[in-house]
Amino acid sequence: MPAVADCTVVFPLRHDPASTHPDVSGLVGKAFERVNWRDAFDTFLAEERSALWAAKTAFDNTDTSAYIAARDALFPQAVSGVHGAVAFRNRAGHKLHETMEAVGLWEYLKGGATRAKGTFTFVDVCGGPGAFSQALFAMGKEHKLRLRGFGLTLRNVKGLDWYTDLPSRSFFPCYGIDGTGDVFKLENIESLCSLTCKENVRLVVADGGFDVPTEVVNFQETISCRIVYGQWLSAVKLLRPGGCFVLKLFDCFSPFTRAILFLTTHLYESVQVVKPRHSRVVNSERYLVCIGFIGAPKQWLEHFERCYQEGFVDNDNIPTVLPTSLFSGDKIFGADVERMSATIASNQVSGLHAILEKLQSKPAMEEVKS
């Protein structure tokens, strides 16, 4: 048996309570420094990152079906199915359920919904085809809550069309001002904000991502920075005070990701990273869970928006949203993000090594071939 297993793990992220908000005034009006996604790492957990990359690279020439067979044999827990009376469309629904349950998010949301007569609105960003929305409606019913949902996703992209059985009277697709549903365009996020301006937006969920070719899979984190930031900014603009946010992340080694996490600890009352059971131990996926939106100072929001419009000029280069000098001295945050990143990476390496050993053993290879 492998030394690790698929199970839900929670990591708190905090900043030093004695510290003040990071001062972005010195960044106003300045041109954004950028770095290519291949060069977007520093020395943070460099040894752990190298070990993880090596463990992934070991499978470059492995047959995909053989890898999947060995993985599923060793880690059978991350499978789809029924939770209680709720059946989810796919594993994404299980991931969201486990993530929300792990931090008591439904109990928090029910408190706010009670004051709003049992109703609240969620927004599903980059959500097509709607696994998260479907799961939220199902779980909301279990918790005796009435939900209204709005969703933004790319239009006319195979596999991203909204599920036809999402409740038509309670779920409202949005494709932005230009009709594309492209979250990379700030005006489409603004359109979604206008559409929900009178709604009690208590929850934003964001599960966006895309397939990364095998030859650059080690750079999944930095290749995904633009879509991660777009979803993160969407929540900052959409949420009402006290609202919550669930965002899919990958590795958290780069200065960009750490800067976003640090800023997040100042924007919400409670921040945690959850690795749910259905998010396989051998992959880099994890979920950022933010509870109790405090709000962003006007200067911050202006800086965030300018970073999105002027900093992300293409998909290859990543702007500096916050210099490391503004968060590297926070020892509490540094310890939390290091523990989270190192633990998930270590578990991932152990799981990948177990799969490799199974593939290299003669009985396992014969079993896979049969």
From Swiss-Prot:
pH-linked activity: Optimum pH is 9.5.
Subcellular localization, as worded in the UniProt entry: Nucleus
Entry's EC annotation: 2.1.1.57
Catalysed conversion reaction: a 5'-end (N(7)-methyl 5'-triphosphoguanosine)-ribonucleoside in mRNA + S-adenosyl-L-methionine = a 5'-end (N(7)-methyl 5'-triphosphoguanosine)-(2'-O-methyl-ribonucleoside) in mRNA + S-adenosyl-L-homocysteine + H(+)
Key words, A-Z: Methyltransferase, mRNA capping, mRNA processing, Nucleus, S-adenosyl-L-methionine, Transferase
Main location: nucleus
List of residues binding S-adenosyl-L-methionine: 130, 207
Impact upon substituting residue 248 to A: 98% reduction of activity
Catalytic residues (positions): 248 (proton acceptor)
GO biological process terms, semicolon-separated: 7-methylguanosine mRNA capping; mRNA modification; RNA methylation
Alphabetized Pfam families for the sequence: FtsJ
InterPro entries (UniProt xref): mRNA_Cap_2O-Ribose_MeTrfase, RNA_MeTrfase_FtsJ_dom, RrmJ-type_MeTrfase, SAM-dependent_MTases_sf
Domain (RrmJ-type SAM-dependent 2'-O-MTase): residue spans on this chain: 87-294
Class of enzymatic activity (EC top level): transferase
GO MF terms held by the record: mRNA (nucleoside-2'-O-)-methyltransferase activity; rRNA methyltransferase activity
Record GO cellular component, one term: nucleus
Function summary: S-adenosyl-L-methionine-dependent methyltransferase that mediates RNA cap1 2'-O-ribose methylation to the 5'-cap structure of spliced leader and U1 small nuclear RNAs. Methylates the ribose of the first nucleotide of a m(7)GpppG-capped RNA to produce m(7)GpppNmp (cap1). Cap1 modification is linked to higher levels of translation. Recognizes a guanosine cap on RNA independent of its N(7) methylation status.
Subunit structure: Component of a complex composed of CBF5, GAR1, NHP2, MTR1, NOP10 and Tb11.01.8210.
Record's protein name: Cap-specific mRNA (nucleoside-2'-O-)-methyltransferase 1
Gene name linked to the record: MTR1
